[in-house]
Regions:
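Conserved alpha-helical substructure of the radical SAM core
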Residues: 1-106, 120-128, 132, 168, ...
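Conserved C-terminal portion of the radical SAM core fold
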Residues: 50-57, 80-82, 103-111, 128-205
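Glycine-centered loop/turn positions within well-structured domains
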Residues: 17, 116, 144
Length: 206
């Protein structure tokens, strides 16, 4: 029997996105290599012995880029599993295999704005492709969530996105960010859509 309720894992160091508020941007600004490595299957199996719930939510990576990620999903079918992803650089057949590998999993897709606009923050993301994959997931896995962080370019599209989510059986979640500094060009105009942090400075300035 597992000894602890849950754990979040950052299982790789890879991501194809260049989100401007991600910790990866800080490493890049400082000319540093993103730390980390791919978790081994052996170490992952050890973790499964201790935890009931497994969350794959990378702080400096996207879990879909672990070369054995589908194998990881197969190994934890008897656990509660949640995947957070925002990268889109996988083909449709890969996503289908991933969804089918663990149909009890919960998937959260980070699409910040209407799918055609999400790349304005999530640089290199194909939001329209990712939205299609989220819609596919909703027909295969247990639960699919559309996570929508509010920025100035998408704050007026929330209700349209909410309806899109409803039409495609996606749970819609609006998130307020606290990673804005004074005169930040991405900060929403409506103060209800962000969390203010006093004296917060641009961490990518070196």
């Amino acid at each position: 029997m597992a000894r602890f309720p849950k754990i979040n894992l950052d299982i790789t160091h890879r991501c194809t996105l260049q989100c401007r508020r991600c910790n990866r941007a800080i490493f890049a600004a400082r000319g540093q290599k993103v730390p980390g490595e791919d978790m081994t299957i052996e170490n992952f199996k050890k973790i499964l012995d201790f935890f009931e719930e497994i969350t794959f939510c990378g702080q400096i990576s996207d879990p879909i880029f672990h070369p054995k990620f589908i194998d990881f999903l197969k190994l934890c079918k008897d656990k509660k599993v949640t995947i957070h992803t925002a990268a889109s650089h996988k083909k449709e057949d890969w996503y289908k295999k991933a969804f089918e590998a663990n149909t009890n999993a919960y998937w959260t897709f980070g699409i910040d704005g209407l799918p055609k606009d999400s790349h304005k923050y999530r640089i290199n993301q194909d939001g329209e492709h990712l939205f299609k994959m989220a819609c596919m997931a909703s027909k295969i896995v247990k639960k699919v969530k559309w996570q929508y962080i509010v920025f100035n370019y998408n704050e007026n599209n929330i209700e349209e996105a909410r309806q899109m989510a409803k039409d495609n059986n996606l749970v819609f979640e609006v998130q307020k960010s606290s990673r804005f500094w004074e005169d930040d060009p991405l900060m929403p105009k409506n103060k209800e859509y962000y969390i203010e942090r006093k004296n917060y400075e641009n961490p990518t300035k070196v």
